[in-house]
Amino acid sequence: MSLLYIILLFTQFLLLPTDAFDRSANTNIAVYWGQNSAGTQESLATYCESSDADIFLLSFLNQFPTLGLNFANACSDTFSDGLLHCTQIAEDIETCQSLGKKVLLSLGGASGSYLFSDDSQAETFAQTLWDTFGEGTGASERPFDSAVVDGFDFDIENNNEVGYSALATKLRTLFAEGTKQYYLSAAPQCPYPDASVGDLLENADIDFAFIQFYNNYCSVSGQFNWDTWLTYAQTVSPNKNIKLFLGLPGSASAAGSGYISDTSLLESTIADIASSSSFGGIALWDASQAFSNELNGEPYVEILKNLLTSASQTATTTVATSKTSAASTSSASTSSASTSQKKTTQSTTSTQSKSKVTLSPTASSAIKTSITQTTKTLTSSTKTKSSLGTTTTESTLNSVAITSMKTTLSSQITSAALVTPQTTTTSIVSSAPIQTAITSTLSPATKSSSVVSLQTATTSTLSPTTTSTSSGSTSSGSTSSDSTARTLAKELNAQYAAGKLNGKSTCTEGEIACSADGKFAVCDHSAWVYMECASGTTCYAYDSGDSVYTQCNFSYLESNYF
Protein backbone atom coordinates (compact mmCIF):
# COMPACT_ATOMS: atom_id res chain seq x y z
CA MET A 1 0.00 0.00 0.00
CA SER A 2 1.53 3.30 -1.10
CA LEU A 3 2.20 6.15 1.32
CA LEU A 4 0.03 8.45 -0.82
CA TYR A 5 -2.94 6.08 -0.53
CA ILE A 6 -2.53 5.92 3.25
CA ILE A 7 -2.46 9.72 3.43
CA LEU A 8 -5.64 9.95 1.33
CA LEU A 9 -7.43 7.47 3.57
CA PHE A 10 -6.37 9.37 6.68
CA THR A 11 -7.52 12.66 5.16
CA GLN A 12 -10.94 11.20 4.32
CA PHE A 13 -11.22 9.90 7.88
CA LEU A 14 -10.57 13.38 9.26
CA LEU A 15 -13.31 14.80 7.04
CA LEU A 16 -15.96 12.34 8.22
CA PRO A 17 -18.79 13.96 10.20
CA THR A 18 -18.19 13.88 13.95
CA ASP A 19 -21.63 13.20 15.36
CA ALA A 20 -21.10 15.03 18.65
CA PHE A 21 -24.76 16.00 18.93
CA ASP A 22 -26.64 14.36 21.80
CA ARG A 23 -30.39 14.65 21.37
CA SER A 24 -31.02 13.48 24.92
CA ALA A 25 -28.74 16.07 26.55
CA ASN A 26 -30.06 18.96 28.63
CA THR A 27 -27.21 21.30 27.68
CA ASN A 28 -27.98 21.95 24.01
CA ILE A 29 -28.25 25.46 22.62
CA ALA A 30 -30.24 26.15 19.47
CA VAL A 31 -29.78 29.41 17.56
CA TYR A 32 -31.69 30.88 14.66
CA TRP A 33 -29.43 32.10 11.88
CA GLY A 34 -30.11 33.99 8.67
CA GLN A 35 -32.04 37.17 9.47
CA ASN A 36 -29.07 39.27 10.65
CA SER A 37 -31.19 41.02 13.26
CA ALA A 38 -28.14 42.63 14.90
CA GLY A 39 -26.63 43.77 11.61
CA THR A 40 -23.39 41.92 12.39
CA GLN A 41 -24.21 38.44 11.11
CA GLU A 42 -21.27 36.24 10.20
CA SER A 43 -21.31 33.14 8.04
CA LEU A 44 -23.08 30.02 9.25
CA ALA A 45 -19.78 28.11 9.30
CA THR A 46 -18.17 30.76 11.52
CA TYR A 47 -20.80 30.25 14.21
CA CYS A 48 -20.62 26.48 13.86
CA GLU A 49 -16.95 26.58 14.83
CA SER A 50 -18.06 27.59 18.32
CA SER A 51 -18.66 24.87 20.89
CA ASP A 52 -21.41 26.98 22.46
CA ALA A 53 -24.20 26.16 19.97
CA ASP A 54 -25.44 22.75 18.86
CA ILE A 55 -28.48 23.29 16.63
CA PHE A 56 -28.68 25.89 13.86
CA LEU A 57 -32.03 26.90 12.42
CA LEU A 58 -31.85 28.43 8.94
CA SER A 59 -34.39 31.24 8.92
CA PHE A 60 -36.49 31.31 6.87
CA LEU A 61 -38.42 29.43 4.24
CA ASN A 62 -40.98 32.21 4.46
CA GLN A 63 -43.14 31.39 1.44
CA PHE A 64 -44.92 28.12 0.75
CA PRO A 65 -46.31 25.95 -0.71
CA THR A 66 -44.78 27.95 -3.59
CA LEU A 67 -41.20 28.13 -2.35
CA GLY A 68 -39.60 31.38 -1.24
CA LEU A 69 -36.49 31.80 0.94
CA ASN A 70 -35.06 34.79 2.79
CA PHE A 71 -31.62 34.86 4.42
CA ALA A 72 -31.13 38.63 4.59
CA ASN A 73 -27.59 39.49 3.45
CA ALA A 74 -26.36 35.88 3.46
CA CYS A 75 -27.70 34.93 0.02
CA SER A 76 -28.78 36.88 -3.06
CA ASP A 77 -28.15 34.62 -6.06
CA THR A 78 -31.25 33.06 -7.60
CA PHE A 79 -32.43 30.49 -10.07
CA SER A 80 -34.25 31.77 -13.16
CA ASP A 81 -37.61 31.67 -11.37
CA GLY A 82 -36.37 33.82 -8.47
CA LEU A 83 -35.81 31.06 -5.89
CA LEU A 84 -32.60 31.67 -3.94
CA HIS A 85 -29.57 29.60 -4.89
CA CYS A 86 -27.24 29.70 -1.87
CA THR A 87 -23.97 27.96 -2.70
CA GLN A 88 -22.06 29.41 0.26
CA ILE A 89 -24.76 28.37 2.72
CA ALA A 90 -24.67 24.92 1.10
CA GLU A 91 -20.95 24.63 1.81
CA ASP A 92 -21.45 25.92 5.35
CA ILE A 93 -24.20 23.38 6.05
CA GLU A 94 -21.80 20.55 5.27
CA THR A 95 -19.06 22.21 7.32
CA CYS A 96 -21.39 22.50 10.29
CA GLN A 97 -22.48 18.90 9.99
CA SER A 98 -18.84 17.77 9.88
CA LEU A 99 -18.41 19.56 13.21
CA GLY A 100 -21.28 17.62 14.76
CA LYS A 101 -23.88 20.38 14.50
CA LYS A 102 -27.47 19.84 13.40
CA VAL A 103 -28.85 22.19 10.76
CA LEU A 104 -32.62 22.51 10.35
CA LEU A 105 -34.53 24.66 7.87
CA SER A 106 -37.08 26.84 9.64
CA LEU A 107 -40.47 27.39 8.00
CA GLY A 108 -42.50 30.53 8.63
CA GLY A 109 -41.29 33.55 10.56
CA ALA A 110 -43.03 36.70 11.69
CA SER A 111 -43.46 37.94 8.13
CA GLY A 112 -44.08 35.95 5.00
CA SER A 113 -46.74 34.37 2.85
CA TYR A 114 -47.48 30.84 3.93
CA LEU A 115 -50.54 28.68 4.60
CA PHE A 116 -52.24 25.48 3.53
CA SER A 117 -55.81 25.16 2.33
CA ASP A 118 -56.12 21.64 3.73
CA ASP A 119 -54.18 18.58 4.91
CA SER A 120 -53.89 17.19 1.40
CA GLN A 121 -51.99 20.24 0.19
CA ALA A 122 -49.69 20.01 3.22
CA GLU A 123 -48.93 16.34 2.58
CA THR A 124 -48.04 17.11 -1.03
CA PHE A 125 -45.74 19.87 0.19
CA ALA A 126 -43.91 17.36 2.40
CA GLN A 127 -42.64 15.67 -0.75
CA THR A 128 -41.53 19.07 -2.10
CA LEU A 129 -39.50 19.70 1.05
CA TRP A 130 -37.96 16.25 0.93
CA ASP A 131 -37.00 16.58 -2.73
CA THR A 132 -35.69 20.15 -2.42
CA PHE A 133 -33.85 20.07 0.90
CA GLY A 134 -33.69 16.40 1.90
CA GLU A 135 -32.64 13.16 0.22
CA GLY A 136 -35.41 13.18 -2.38
CA THR A 137 -34.59 13.36 -6.08
CA GLY A 138 -37.69 14.95 -7.58
CA ALA A 139 -36.59 18.61 -7.58
CA SER A 140 -34.86 20.35 -10.47
CA GLU A 141 -33.75 23.23 -8.25
CA ARG A 142 -31.99 22.73 -4.92
CA PRO A 143 -31.15 26.00 -3.12
CA PHE A 144 -28.46 24.22 -1.08
CA ASP A 145 -27.22 22.06 -3.97
CA SER A 146 -26.23 18.62 -2.67
CA ALA A 147 -26.29 19.65 1.00
CA VAL A 148 -29.04 17.93 2.97
CA VAL A 149 -30.52 19.55 6.06
CA ASP A 150 -31.11 17.56 9.25
CA GLY A 151 -34.79 18.37 9.50
CA PHE A 152 -37.35 21.15 9.64
CA ASP A 153 -38.52 23.67 12.19
CA PHE A 154 -42.03 25.16 12.34
CA ASP A 155 -41.86 28.82 13.37
CA ILE A 156 -45.44 29.48 12.30
CA GLU A 157 -46.81 32.83 13.46
CA ASN A 158 -49.91 33.50 11.36
CA ASN A 159 -52.46 31.92 13.74
CA ASN A 160 -53.47 29.34 11.14
CA GLU A 161 -52.95 25.73 12.23
CA VAL A 162 -54.26 24.01 9.09
CA GLY A 163 -52.04 21.31 7.63
CA TYR A 164 -48.97 21.30 9.85
CA SER A 165 -49.77 18.12 11.72
CA ALA A 166 -50.37 16.34 8.41
CA LEU A 167 -47.15 17.82 7.00
CA ALA A 168 -45.09 16.60 9.96
CA THR A 169 -46.61 13.12 9.85
CA LYS A 170 -45.88 12.80 6.13
CA LEU A 171 -42.32 14.02 6.63
CA ARG A 172 -41.81 11.26 9.19
CA THR A 173 -42.68 8.64 6.57
CA LEU A 174 -40.21 10.24 4.15
CA PHE A 175 -37.50 10.44 6.81
CA ALA A 176 -37.75 6.67 7.15
CA GLU A 177 -36.44 6.41 3.59
CA GLY A 178 -33.34 8.45 4.44
CA THR A 179 -29.85 7.43 5.45
CA LYS A 180 -29.54 9.50 8.64
CA GLN A 181 -31.47 10.77 11.66
CA TYR A 182 -33.87 13.65 10.94
CA TYR A 183 -35.55 15.99 13.41
CA LEU A 184 -38.69 18.10 13.60
CA SER A 185 -39.08 21.10 15.87
CA ALA A 186 -41.58 23.87 16.58
CA ALA A 187 -41.31 27.36 18.07
CA PRO A 188 -44.53 28.09 19.96
CA GLN A 189 -45.24 31.30 21.84
CA CYS A 190 -45.30 30.67 25.59
CA PRO A 191 -49.10 31.18 26.08
CA TYR A 192 -50.58 27.68 25.98
CA PRO A 193 -51.91 26.44 23.64
CA ASP A 194 -50.13 28.24 20.83
CA ALA A 195 -52.51 29.66 18.23
CA SER A 196 -50.33 28.60 15.29
CA VAL A 197 -48.64 25.31 16.20
CA GLY A 198 -50.88 24.08 19.02
CA ASP A 199 -52.49 21.42 16.85
CA LEU A 200 -49.10 20.36 15.48
CA LEU A 201 -47.67 19.91 18.97
CA GLU A 202 -50.72 17.98 20.11
CA ASN A 203 -50.93 15.57 17.18
CA ALA A 204 -47.48 15.15 15.61
CA ASP A 205 -44.18 13.59 16.64
CA ILE A 206 -42.02 16.64 17.39
CA ASP A 207 -38.48 16.33 18.76
CA PHE A 208 -37.88 19.84 20.09
CA ALA A 209 -40.10 22.71 21.25
CA PHE A 210 -38.30 26.06 21.24
CA ILE A 211 -40.74 27.95 23.47
CA GLN A 212 -40.61 31.73 23.04
CA PHE A 213 -40.61 33.25 26.53
CA TYR A 214 -40.28 36.75 25.12
CA ASN A 215 -42.56 39.34 23.53
CA ASN A 216 -45.29 37.77 25.66
CA TYR A 217 -46.80 38.23 29.11
CA CYS A 218 -45.20 34.95 30.19
CA SER A 219 -41.46 35.30 30.67
CA VAL A 220 -38.75 34.23 33.07
CA SER A 221 -39.13 37.53 34.92
CA GLY A 222 -42.85 37.11 35.54
CA GLN A 223 -45.72 34.68 35.02
CA PHE A 224 -43.26 31.99 33.95
CA ASN A 225 -45.46 29.07 32.88
CA TRP A 226 -42.78 26.43 32.36
CA ASP A 227 -44.79 23.93 34.40
CA THR A 228 -47.65 24.18 31.92
CA TRP A 229 -45.31 23.20 29.11
CA LEU A 230 -43.77 20.47 31.21
CA THR A 231 -47.21 18.96 31.70
CA TYR A 232 -47.77 19.21 27.95
CA ALA A 233 -44.55 17.28 27.34
CA GLN A 234 -45.40 14.57 29.83
CA THR A 235 -49.12 14.11 29.18
CA VAL A 236 -50.14 15.61 25.83
CA SER A 237 -47.29 15.34 23.33
CA PRO A 238 -47.36 12.17 21.19
CA ASN A 239 -43.60 12.09 21.69
CA LYS A 240 -43.02 11.60 25.41
CA ASN A 241 -39.31 12.20 24.79
CA ILE A 242 -39.85 15.68 23.37
CA LYS A 243 -37.26 18.18 24.59
CA LEU A 244 -38.39 21.60 25.79
CA PHE A 245 -36.07 24.57 25.21
CA LEU A 246 -36.16 27.85 27.09
CA GLY A 247 -36.49 30.40 24.28
CA LEU A 248 -34.78 33.74 24.98
CA PRO A 249 -33.67 36.84 23.06
CA GLY A 250 -29.93 36.96 22.39
CA SER A 251 -29.73 40.59 23.51
CA ALA A 252 -31.87 43.53 24.56
CA SER A 253 -32.32 44.58 20.93
CA ALA A 254 -33.40 41.11 19.80
CA ALA A 255 -36.94 41.41 21.20
CA GLY A 256 -39.35 43.92 22.65
CA SER A 257 -39.37 42.17 26.02
CA GLY A 258 -38.03 39.06 27.72
CA TYR A 259 -34.27 39.64 27.53
CA ILE A 260 -32.45 38.70 30.75
CA SER A 261 -29.08 40.23 31.61
CA ASP A 262 -29.27 39.15 35.26
CA THR A 263 -27.05 36.07 35.28
CA SER A 264 -28.13 35.12 38.81
CA LEU A 265 -31.75 34.97 37.62
CA LEU A 266 -30.69 32.90 34.63
CA GLU A 267 -28.71 30.57 36.87
CA SER A 268 -31.54 30.00 39.33
CA THR A 269 -34.10 29.53 36.55
CA ILE A 270 -31.99 26.98 34.73
CA ALA A 271 -31.29 25.16 38.00
CA ASP A 272 -35.04 24.99 38.67
CA ILE A 273 -36.01 23.50 35.31
CA ALA A 274 -32.94 21.51 34.26
CA SER A 275 -33.70 18.57 36.54
CA SER A 276 -36.63 17.45 34.40
CA SER A 277 -35.93 14.81 31.77
CA SER A 278 -38.00 16.93 29.35
CA PHE A 279 -35.57 19.85 29.50
CA GLY A 280 -33.34 20.14 26.45
CA GLY A 281 -31.54 23.46 26.77
CA ILE A 282 -31.92 27.02 25.50
CA ALA A 283 -33.04 28.44 22.14
CA LEU A 284 -31.86 31.91 21.11
CA TRP A 285 -32.99 34.57 18.66
CA ASP A 286 -30.69 34.98 16.94
CA ALA A 287 -27.05 34.06 16.28
CA SER A 288 -26.03 37.60 15.32
CA GLN A 289 -27.39 38.86 18.65
CA ALA A 290 -26.31 36.07 21.00
CA PHE A 291 -22.71 35.88 19.77
CA SER A 292 -22.06 39.63 19.58
CA ASN A 293 -23.78 40.55 22.86
CA GLU A 294 -21.28 40.48 25.72
CA LEU A 295 -21.73 40.68 29.48
CA ASN A 296 -18.51 41.50 31.32
CA GLY A 297 -16.55 40.62 28.20
CA GLU A 298 -18.14 37.19 27.73
CA PRO A 299 -20.49 36.38 24.82
CA TYR A 300 -24.07 35.83 25.97
CA VAL A 301 -24.28 32.46 24.26
CA GLU A 302 -21.15 31.31 26.09
CA ILE A 303 -22.57 32.42 29.44
CA LEU A 304 -25.71 30.40 28.82
CA LYS A 305 -23.76 27.33 27.71
CA ASN A 306 -21.68 27.46 30.89
CA LEU A 307 -24.80 27.81 33.05
CA LEU A 308 -26.38 24.80 31.33
CA THR A 309 -23.24 22.73 31.81
CA SER A 310 -22.97 23.73 35.46
CA ALA A 311 -26.63 22.88 36.13
CA SER A 312 -26.23 19.51 34.44
CA GLN A 313 -23.12 18.68 36.46
CA THR A 314 -24.84 19.72 39.69
CA ALA A 315 -27.78 17.45 38.91
CA THR A 316 -25.41 14.57 38.15
CA THR A 317 -23.51 15.15 41.40
CA THR A 318 -26.77 15.22 43.37
CA VAL A 319 -27.86 11.89 41.91
CA ALA A 320 -24.46 10.36 42.64
CA THR A 321 -24.53 11.61 46.23
CA SER A 322 -28.01 10.22 46.70
CA LYS A 323 -26.92 6.82 45.43
CA THR A 324 -23.87 6.85 47.70
CA SER A 325 -26.05 7.74 50.67
CA ALA A 326 -28.40 4.86 49.93
CA ALA A 327 -25.52 2.42 49.64
CA SER A 328 -24.05 3.63 52.91
CA THR A 329 -27.36 3.23 54.72
CA SER A 330 -27.83 -0.33 53.52
CA SER A 331 -24.32 -1.34 54.56
CA ALA A 332 -24.60 -0.70 58.28
CA SER A 333 -22.83 -3.97 59.11
CA THR A 334 -19.61 -3.16 57.26
CA SER A 335 -16.37 -2.33 59.04
CA SER A 336 -15.94 0.90 60.97
CA ALA A 337 -13.50 2.13 58.34
CA SER A 338 -16.40 2.65 55.93
CA THR A 339 -17.43 6.27 55.37
CA SER A 340 -21.14 6.92 55.73
CA GLN A 341 -23.00 9.63 53.86
CA LYS A 342 -25.27 12.01 55.71
CA LYS A 343 -28.77 12.01 54.31
CA THR A 344 -29.83 15.33 52.89
CA THR A 345 -33.51 14.88 53.75
CA GLN A 346 -34.32 14.67 57.44
CA SER A 347 -37.58 14.05 59.24
CA THR A 348 -39.13 17.12 60.80
CA THR A 349 -41.82 17.11 63.43
CA SER A 350 -43.91 20.20 63.02
CA THR A 351 -47.36 21.62 63.26
CA GLN A 352 -49.00 23.27 60.31
CA SER A 353 -51.25 26.21 59.81
CA LYS A 354 -52.97 26.41 56.43
CA SER A 355 -54.47 29.44 54.79
CA LYS A 356 -55.66 29.44 51.22
CA VAL A 357 -55.47 32.35 48.83
CA THR A 358 -57.14 31.85 45.47
CA LEU A 359 -56.02 34.26 42.80
CA SER A 360 -58.14 34.73 39.73
CA PRO A 361 -58.22 37.00 36.67
CA THR A 362 -58.97 40.68 37.17
CA ALA A 363 -58.59 43.86 35.33
CA SER A 364 -57.45 45.79 38.38
CA SER A 365 -56.71 44.50 41.81
CA ALA A 366 -54.17 44.84 44.57
CA ILE A 367 -53.87 42.06 47.09
CA LYS A 368 -51.89 42.57 50.26
CA THR A 369 -51.27 39.45 52.30
CA SER A 370 -49.75 39.67 55.75
CA ILE A 371 -48.41 36.48 57.28
CA THR A 372 -47.14 36.47 60.84
CA GLN A 373 -45.79 33.55 62.76
CA THR A 374 -43.17 32.48 65.26
CA THR A 375 -39.66 31.56 64.27
CA LYS A 376 -39.50 28.06 62.84
CA THR A 377 -36.67 26.10 61.23
CA LEU A 378 -37.60 23.37 58.81
CA THR A 379 -35.55 21.02 56.68
CA SER A 380 -36.94 19.40 53.59
CA SER A 381 -36.97 19.48 49.82
CA THR A 382 -39.21 20.88 47.14
CA LYS A 383 -40.95 19.03 44.37
CA THR A 384 -43.20 20.61 41.76
CA LYS A 385 -45.95 18.96 39.77
CA SER A 386 -48.28 20.61 37.31
CA SER A 387 -51.28 20.35 35.08
CA LEU A 388 -52.26 22.67 32.29
CA GLY A 389 -53.12 26.03 33.75
CA THR A 390 -52.58 24.90 37.35
CA THR A 391 -49.44 24.58 39.45
CA THR A 392 -49.48 22.32 42.49
CA THR A 393 -46.46 22.62 44.74
CA GLU A 394 -45.49 20.19 47.46
CA SER A 395 -43.03 22.05 49.60
CA THR A 396 -41.47 22.81 52.89
CA LEU A 397 -38.84 25.45 53.52
CA ASN A 398 -35.17 24.59 53.56
CA SER A 399 -33.69 25.25 57.01
CA VAL A 400 -34.74 28.87 57.35
CA ALA A 401 -35.87 30.75 60.41
CA ILE A 402 -38.82 32.97 59.59
CA THR A 403 -40.27 35.48 61.97
CA SER A 404 -42.58 37.34 59.64
CA MET A 405 -43.38 37.70 55.99
CA LYS A 406 -45.41 40.13 53.95
CA THR A 407 -46.40 39.45 50.37
CA THR A 408 -47.83 42.17 48.17
CA LEU A 409 -49.41 41.30 44.84
CA SER A 410 -50.00 44.33 42.65
CA SER A 411 -51.71 44.85 39.33
CA GLN A 412 -48.94 42.83 37.71
CA ILE A 413 -51.24 39.86 38.33
CA THR A 414 -52.48 38.78 34.95
CA SER A 415 -55.90 37.86 36.09
CA ALA A 416 -58.61 39.03 38.36
CA ALA A 417 -58.36 38.16 41.98
CA LEU A 418 -60.85 36.41 44.17
CA VAL A 419 -59.50 36.25 47.69
CA THR A 420 -61.23 34.20 50.32
CA PRO A 421 -59.91 35.19 53.76
CA GLN A 422 -59.88 32.43 56.26
CA THR A 423 -58.06 31.66 59.45
CA THR A 424 -57.51 28.02 60.20
CA THR A 425 -55.21 26.23 62.54
CA THR A 426 -54.55 22.54 62.06
CA SER A 427 -51.98 20.64 64.07
CA ILE A 428 -50.35 17.59 62.57
CA VAL A 429 -47.17 15.68 63.25
CA SER A 430 -45.40 14.21 60.27
CA SER A 431 -41.98 13.16 59.06
CA ALA A 432 -43.02 13.50 55.42
CA PRO A 433 -43.39 16.68 53.38
CA ILE A 434 -46.73 18.44 53.87
CA GLN A 435 -48.61 19.06 50.63
CA THR A 436 -49.98 22.53 50.04
CA ALA A 437 -51.98 23.17 46.88
CA ILE A 438 -51.46 26.55 45.27
CA THR A 439 -53.29 27.77 42.19
CA SER A 440 -52.02 31.05 40.81
CA THR A 441 -51.23 33.08 37.73
CA LEU A 442 -49.24 36.18 38.53
CA SER A 443 -46.32 38.38 37.65
CA PRO A 444 -44.18 38.78 40.76
CA ALA A 445 -41.55 41.47 41.03
CA THR A 446 -38.96 38.95 42.12
CA LYS A 447 -38.54 35.29 41.30
CA SER A 448 -40.24 33.70 44.26
CA SER A 449 -43.30 31.67 45.04
CA SER A 450 -46.40 33.69 44.20
CA VAL A 451 -48.32 32.53 47.25
CA VAL A 452 -46.46 31.68 50.42
CA SER A 453 -47.65 28.74 52.49
CA LEU A 454 -45.54 28.21 55.58
CA GLN A 455 -45.49 25.28 57.97
CA THR A 456 -45.64 26.79 61.44
CA ALA A 457 -47.23 26.23 64.80
CA THR A 458 -49.05 29.56 64.75
CA THR A 459 -52.10 30.79 62.91
CA SER A 460 -51.61 32.60 59.58
CA THR A 461 -54.05 35.44 59.05
CA LEU A 462 -54.56 36.80 55.56
CA SER A 463 -55.97 40.29 55.16
CA PRO A 464 -56.90 40.99 51.54
CA THR A 465 -57.86 44.38 50.25
CA THR A 466 -61.15 44.85 48.48
CA THR A 467 -61.30 43.56 44.91
CA SER A 468 -63.40 45.67 42.62
CA THR A 469 -64.48 45.61 39.00
CA SER A 470 -65.68 48.44 36.85
CA SER A 471 -69.30 49.48 36.89
CA GLY A 472 -69.67 48.13 33.39
CA SER A 473 -69.01 44.60 34.56
CA THR A 474 -71.99 44.32 36.85
CA SER A 475 -74.53 43.47 34.20
CA SER A 476 -73.97 39.74 34.11
CA GLY A 477 -76.33 36.84 33.98
CA SER A 478 -75.39 35.52 37.40
CA THR A 479 -78.03 33.98 39.59
CA SER A 480 -78.32 33.52 43.33
CA SER A 481 -77.24 29.90 42.90
CA ASP A 482 -73.93 30.88 41.28
CA SER A 483 -70.76 30.52 43.32
CA THR A 484 -68.73 33.62 44.06
CA ALA A 485 -66.18 32.54 41.45
CA ARG A 486 -68.85 31.94 38.79
CA THR A 487 -70.37 35.35 39.51
CA LEU A 488 -66.99 37.03 39.08
CA ALA A 489 -66.36 35.16 35.82
CA LYS A 490 -69.70 36.33 34.44
CA GLU A 491 -69.00 39.91 35.50
CA LEU A 492 -65.63 39.85 33.77
CA ASN A 493 -67.12 38.39 30.59
CA ALA A 494 -69.76 41.11 30.54
CA GLN A 495 -66.94 43.63 30.84
CA TYR A 496 -64.97 41.98 28.03
CA ALA A 497 -68.04 41.72 25.78
CA ALA A 498 -68.61 45.46 26.23
CA GLY A 499 -65.10 46.09 24.92
CA LYS A 500 -63.89 47.45 28.26
CA LEU A 501 -60.91 45.08 28.70
CA ASN A 502 -59.67 45.92 32.21
CA GLY A 503 -62.28 48.62 32.70
CA LYS A 504 -59.73 51.44 32.72
CA SER A 505 -58.26 53.87 30.22
CA THR A 506 -54.75 52.55 30.87
CA CYS A 507 -53.20 49.16 31.53
CA THR A 508 -50.32 47.86 33.60
CA GLU A 509 -47.52 45.75 32.14
CA GLY A 510 -48.55 42.10 32.10
CA GLU A 511 -52.30 42.58 32.63
CA ILE A 512 -54.48 40.28 30.57
CA ALA A 513 -58.05 40.52 29.36
CA CYS A 514 -60.21 39.51 26.42
CA SER A 515 -61.32 41.66 23.53
CA ALA A 516 -64.97 41.89 22.56
CA ASP A 517 -64.33 39.61 19.57
CA GLY A 518 -62.62 36.88 21.64
CA LYS A 519 -58.96 37.74 21.20
CA PHE A 520 -56.48 37.28 24.03
CA ALA A 521 -55.20 40.70 25.14
CA VAL A 522 -51.93 41.41 26.96
CA CYS A 523 -50.67 44.79 28.16
CA ASP A 524 -47.21 45.45 26.74
CA HIS A 525 -45.51 48.81 27.33
CA SER A 526 -48.81 50.42 28.38
CA ALA A 527 -50.61 49.27 25.23
CA TRP A 528 -52.86 46.29 24.58
CA VAL A 529 -51.48 43.61 22.27
CA TYR A 530 -54.01 41.18 20.78
CA MET A 531 -53.47 37.53 19.90
CA GLU A 532 -55.84 35.15 18.15
CA CYS A 533 -56.82 32.08 20.13
CA ALA A 534 -56.20 28.64 18.67
CA SER A 535 -58.81 27.13 16.40
CA GLY A 536 -61.85 25.98 18.39
CA THR A 537 -61.07 28.26 21.31
CA THR A 538 -61.88 31.84 22.27
CA CYS A 539 -60.94 34.16 25.10
CA TYR A 540 -63.18 34.47 28.15
CA ALA A 541 -63.17 34.24 31.94
CA TYR A 542 -64.21 30.98 33.56
CA ASP A 543 -64.14 29.48 37.02
CA SER A 544 -62.75 26.22 38.32
CA GLY A 545 -63.41 25.54 41.97
CA ASP A 546 -62.76 28.76 43.84
CA SER A 547 -60.56 30.17 41.09
CA VAL A 548 -61.29 32.31 38.06
CA TYR A 549 -59.11 32.33 34.95
CA THR A 550 -58.95 34.54 31.87
CA GLN A 551 -57.46 32.81 28.85
CA CYS A 552 -58.29 31.02 25.62
CA ASN A 553 -60.62 28.10 26.29
CA PHE A 554 -62.97 25.88 24.30
CA SER A 555 -65.61 27.92 22.48
CA TYR A 556 -68.45 25.49 23.14
CA LEU A 557 -68.11 26.06 26.90
CA GLU A 558 -68.23 29.85 26.71
CA SER A 559 -72.01 30.16 27.16
CA ASN A 560 -71.74 28.68 30.66
CA TYR A 561 -69.99 31.81 31.87
CA PHE A 562 -72.34 34.52 30.60
From Swiss-Prot:
Its post-translational modification remark reads: Extensively glycosylated with a series of short O-linked mannose oligosaccharides ranging in size from Man(2) to Man(5).
A GO CC term attached to the entry? cellular bud neck
Record's signal peptide: 1-20
Q: Where is this region: Disordered?
A: 329-358, 461-484
User: Locate the GH18 domain: which residues?
Assistant: 27-311
Report whether Cell wall biogenesis/degradation shows up as a keyword of the record.
yes
UniProt KW keywords: Carbohydrate metabolism, Cell wall, Cell wall biogenesis/degradation, Chitin degradation, Chitin-binding, Glycoprotein, Glycosidase, Hydrolase, Polysaccharide degradation, Secreted, Signal
Catalysed transformations (reactions) = Random endo-hydrolysis of N-acetyl-beta-D-glucosaminide (1->4)-beta-linkages in chitin and chitodextrins
Q: State the family named in the UniProt similarity comment for this chain.
A: Belongs to the glycosyl hydrolase 18 family. Chitinase class V subfamily.
What does the function comment of this entry state? Chitinase is required for cell separation during growth of S.cerevisiae.
Q: Quote the record's miscellaneous comment.
A: Present with 6350 molecules/cell in log phase SD medium.
Q: What is this protein called?
A: Endochitinase
Organism, by scientific name, is: Saccharomyces cerevisiae (strain ATCC 204508 / S288c) (Baker's yeast)
